[in-house]
Amino acid sequence: NGPHPAGLTGTHMHFLDPPNSTKTVWSISYQDVIAVGNLFLTGYLNISRVISIAGPLAKKPRLIRTVLGASLTDILKDEFYENEPCRVISGSVLSGFQAEGDLSFLGRYSRQVTLIKEDEDKLFFGWINPQPNKFSVMPVLASAFSFFKLFNLTTNLNGGRRAMVPTGVFETLMPQDFLPTQLLRSLIVMDTDVAQSLGALELDEEDISLCTFACPAKYEYGSALRDSLEKIEKEG
C-alpha cells in the first residue's frame, strides 16, 4: 500500500522473500493466473489480455481487451493526435520500451500502452529559468509550489549526461533497505561484486526506473543493471 514503487513485484519480494545467489523467487501476474485457471477448466489457453491506452497524447484513455503480442500499429489507429510527434511505448514510461519497427508489438509483460510527445526542444538558459510548468523531483523549480498540478511529460531529457552527483534524491525513491547511491554507482562502473553485496540480485529494471527518471546525470540505470546481471550470470 502506498505510492509507486510500492506495488512492484521486486518491492514485495524484498520484504517477503528476497532472492539471492542461491535462491530463485518466481512471480506471476494476475492476468496470467486467470489464464492458467482457464486452461485447467477448459483445456484452452486464453491469450486475451486487458490493457490500458494512456498518456498525454491519447485521445481516449481507457481499458481495452486485446491479445498477447498484438500489433500496436493496429491497436492505435486513430488513438492519438497525429499533429504531434508521438512516441509509442509498450508498457509504462518508466519501464516500457519504444514500440517501433520490428518492436511495434505489445510486450509480453506490458499491461499498458503509453503515448507521449517526442520532444527535443532546447530551453535557452533553462538551468536558471524558474519554469513553473515543468515537473521536477527535487523542489528546485517554481513548479514545486503547484502541489496538485498535473504535468504532461515528454521524451525530453532536459540536459545531457554528466558525472553522477549524490544529491540524496535516490534515497527518497527506493523503499528497499539498500544504499541506492552506492548501488547505482557500482552498476555504472560494472563492479559486480559490490553490486551483489548491495542487493543487485533482488532487482530488475523496473525496480530502479524511478532513479533513472530522477537522475540529474541522465544515466540509464536499468540497462546498467541488466548488463551487470548478465555479467554475474556468466561469471558465476
Regions found by a protein language model. Name each.
Residues 1-74, 78-236:
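Buried, small/hydrophobic-residue-enriched core segments of structured protein domains
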